[in-house]
Amino acid sequence: SHFIIISPEYNGSFPGVLKMLFDTSRSHEIWFHKKALLTGVATGRAGNLRGMDHLADVLNYVKITVHPNKLPISAVNSVVNSDGKIIDNNTLKAINQQLDEFILWASLQTQPSNH
């Protein structure tokens, strides 16, 4: 199982409701040894870089392996239109590259044994 998490910036991190999801779920059964791809979005210039780092720490704690290419999307209101469609070609290319890398990376990873 794989997860793609697109997280907005919230006070320099990721939203607390997302942390609550990990805190209140049955971590071992749901999250352990899964893989995740992170994309951060923000209206500012950093694209939620700090939030993705915080989130990666939480994910690593619950034994989710995080893909190394975390994509920050800055000034999201200028790359996405009011219908939610991406209108910036460079952003679209970066997203497609990240997804292609994740698909390849996830397919090469092996599941740990249950010894």
Where in the sequence are the language-model features?
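Glycine-rich phosphate/pyrophosphate-binding loop and the adjoining helix
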Residues: 65-115
